Regions:
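Short glycine/proline-centered loop/turn elements that form peptide/ligand docking sites
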Residues: 6, 13-16
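The alpha-helix within a helix-turn-helix
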Residues: 7, 21
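Minor-groove-contacting beta-hairpin "wing" of winged helix-turn-helix DNA-binding domains
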Residues: 34-40
Length: 123
């Protein structure tokens, strides 16, 4: 399949796909003349790259996994699982921080009501 079809199947732009290749996240596509030719495995790879980005992984983090894959001739599942666990822990911490922020906003609102409405202090 050509890059346009890969793009439409994955939601990635052709420019993004070429960027993934340049970074080494995708193997360099075979060529037919001036056209890149992709395979079904590339569809899955691009979908995983996009999902990983959507959940907060940077392209450099993905590159590190990709480098290990090519170095060891197999995808580093254990390393990926560790990174996912770490990202999940970061999300848990972010949720806690957002909950604290929400509590602070409620406290601020309560203090404004207490000060300016209950005690009728001019604003």
């Amino acid at each position: 399949m050509y890059i346009g079809e890969l793009a439409s199947l994955t939601g990635a732009t052709p420019k993004a796909i070429r960027h993934y290749e340049k970074l080494g996240l995708l193997p360099v596509a075979k060529r037919k003349g001036n056209y890149r030719i992709y395979e079904e495995i590339d569809v899955q790879s691009v979908k995983m790259i996009r999902l990983a980005q959507a959940v907060g992984f940077s392209l450099s983090e993905l590159y590190d996994l990709s480098a290990l894959k090519y170095k060891n001739n197999r995808f580093p599942v254990e390393v990926a699982q560790q990174l996912i666990q770490k990202k999940n822990q970061q999300i848990i911490e972010q949720k806690k921080a957002l909950n604290r922020l929400q509590e602070d906003l409620k406290q601020l609102e309560d203090e404004i009501i207490q000060t300016y409405i209950t005690h009728k202090i001019p604003a």
